[in-house]
């Protein structure tokens, strides 16, 4: 077993004693849970569509290996390199999103994927974490240079990304991106009057989505009135939780995976509820809650606004996505095809999440021994007071 002493000055040694090992452990545990649940849920799906039983399992493992490398590699980066990589990555994501609209693969009326040698690549997944860091950079730079139009530029970038997502269309991803943007603007100290205006615009956007996108209207209608349309998938998901009880039917003994086409993706939480039971399902909820809250508590002691905004944006993205997926599975929210982070099948999602959490691990690493230094934005960083308090109540 490799051990690192506190005096070890190697790159890995310094990383080991400064990274949040609890957050890292929860990330790895959640990935492991995902592989186990995909092994339980996907063979029935693969058999139903004529593929080898472990087709989806092996493909997920194929993506898991680079995801682990990315997670560890990104967590080694200094703050300035997180920003640089995210800026380049976000600009590339925008180009790929435009390419998706032109030459992408269309499924169920949505054009969200690009085919790379038999692998479907979803650029919007990679836009989410890089967007959070990109806008955090612009908003924090406004503090270092008061004349810099950080609010305006961040808003323009958000609107461009939202526009590209709506053209696919992908209303769920749009909701996640918009929530990240609003959260970051709020943390950056935007006036409350502007927050009220954004809330009104958001409400108008929700009404517009209902009016303009028939599939959105149908899902909301079915959520409010189950007799207004087909609710087979949600009903099957609810029955799965009922069948599972407290301790589940046992691994491999569930039924819901044999009747739902996306049991290995959007409804993998229902598979967990049926085969592992309520207690295991609550443990999965606890994993996500711990992951988000642990990092947020760590950010309370942070003095670099860029770190707070970037990490906070990524955590909001992951937390909201988990809430939406699990909420849909138990019919607390209208149906929406959104994967459960680190657990559902999906290569693009897994790699993008590894990038995002790698960024968070890098940004939240302890930087001991520095009393007063300049950050990459030119701000003066001190060990105290906490970041949110130092922003004059911006949070």
In which residue ranges do the predicted regions lie?
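Short, Lys/Arg-rich, polar N-terminal cytosolic tail immediately upstream
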Residues: 1-17
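Hydrophobic alpha-helical transmembrane segments of multi-pass inner membrane proteins, especially
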Residues: 24-40, 46-233, 270-328, 355-359, ...
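Transmembrane alpha-helices of multi-pass inner-membrane enzymes
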Residues: 32, 331-374
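Glycine/serine-rich anion-binding loops at beta->alpha junctions
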Residues: 117-127, 167-169, 245, 249, ...
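Long extracytoplasmic/lumenal interhelical loops at the membrane interface
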Residues: 245-279
């Amino acid at each position: 077993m490799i051990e690192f002493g506190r005096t070890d000055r190697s790159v890995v040694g310094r990383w080991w004693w400064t990274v949040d090992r609890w957050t890292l452990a929860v990330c790895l545990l959640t990935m492991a849970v995902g592989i186990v649940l995909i092994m339980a849920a996907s063979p029935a799906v693969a058999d139903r569509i004529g593929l080898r039983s472990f087709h989806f399992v092996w493909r997920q493992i194929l993506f898991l290996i680079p995801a682990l490398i990315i997670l560890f590699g990104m967590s080694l980066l200094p703050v300035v390199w997180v920003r640089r990589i995210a800026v380049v990555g976000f600009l590339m994501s925008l180009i790929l999103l435009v390419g998706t609209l032109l030459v992408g693969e269309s499924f169920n009326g949505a054009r969200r994927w690009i085919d790379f040698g038999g692998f479907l690549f979803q650029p919007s997944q990679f836009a989410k974490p890089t967007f959070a860091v990109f806008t955090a950079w612009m908003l924090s730079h406004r503090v270092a240079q008061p004349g810099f139009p950080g609010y305006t530029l961040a808003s323009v970038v958000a609107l461009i990304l939202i526009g590209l997502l709506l053209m696919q269309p992908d209303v769920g991803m749009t909701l996640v991106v918009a929530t990240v943007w609003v959260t970051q603007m709020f943390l950056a100290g935007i006036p409350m009057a502007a927050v009220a205006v954004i809330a009104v615009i958001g409400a108008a956007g929700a009404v517009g989505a209902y009016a303009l996108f028939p599939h959105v209207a149908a899902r909301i209608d079915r959520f409010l009135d189950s007799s207004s349309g087909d609710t087979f998938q949600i009903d099957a998901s609810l029955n799965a939780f009922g069948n599972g009880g407290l301790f589940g039917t046992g691994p491999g003994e569930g039924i819901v995976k044999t009747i739902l086409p996306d049991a290995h993706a959007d409804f993998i939480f229902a598979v967990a509820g049926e085969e592992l039971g309520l207690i295991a399902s609550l443990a999965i909820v606890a994993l996500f809650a711990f992951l988000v809250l642990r990092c947020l508590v760590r950010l309370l002691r942070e003095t670099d606004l860029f770190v707070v905004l970037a990490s906070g944006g990524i955590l909001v993205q992951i937390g909201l996505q988990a809430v939406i997926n699990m909420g849909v599975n138990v019919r607390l929210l209208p149906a929406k095809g959104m994967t459960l982070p680190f657990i559902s099948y999906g290569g693009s999602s897994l790699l993008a999440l590894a990038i995002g959490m790698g960024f968070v691990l890098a940004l939240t690493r302890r930087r001991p021994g520095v009393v007063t230094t300049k950050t990459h934005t030119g701000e003066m960083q001190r060990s105290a007071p906490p970041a949110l308090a130092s922003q004059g109540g911006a949070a």
